[in-house]
């Protein structure tokens, strides 16, 4: 009987750990994605999507709208960057970001910011 109660206690503890760790991972992902969206909005950069230029606020609104429609499928911040924030779902073309005459893909730009964010919030 004692062995059974110890096993039951162990199962309960493991279940609690899984529940808590899943919630923490979800909160971290949400915090990270919200930070990236705010990072886009507050930048002084020009966002180039399918050859047309947009302001930082327009870029954030566009990416946030895409994310809202499929957020239940996005499990990580990296997936958010690669599938939502870095390329057109219609043309497949990469989004570009132009900051102070330097142009790069939004995937590179946001991946770097995600690394910076994580290093500040460990």
Where are these regions (language model features)?
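Bacterial N-terminal signal peptides that target proteins for export
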Residues: 1-12
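Compact alpha-helical subdomains of small soluble proteins
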Residues: 51-122
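N-terminal secretory signal peptides
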Residues: 26-66
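Bacterial N-terminal signal peptides
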Residues: 10-20
């Amino acid at each position: 009987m004692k062995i059974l109660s110890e096993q039951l206690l162990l199962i309960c503890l493991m279940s609690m750990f899984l529940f808590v760790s899943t919630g923490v991972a979800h909160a971290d992902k949400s915090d990270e994605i919200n930070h990236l969206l705010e990072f886009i909005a507050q930048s002084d950069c020009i966002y180039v999507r399918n050859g047309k230029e947009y302001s930082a606020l327009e870029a954030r609104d566009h990416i946030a709208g895409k994310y809202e429609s499929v957020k239940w499928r996005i499990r990580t911040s990296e997936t958010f960057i690669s599938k939502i924030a870095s390329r057109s779902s219609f043309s497949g073309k990469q989004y570009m970001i132009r900051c102070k005459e330097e142009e790069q893909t939004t995937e590179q730009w946001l991946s770097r910011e995600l690394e910076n964010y994580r290093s500040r919030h460990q």
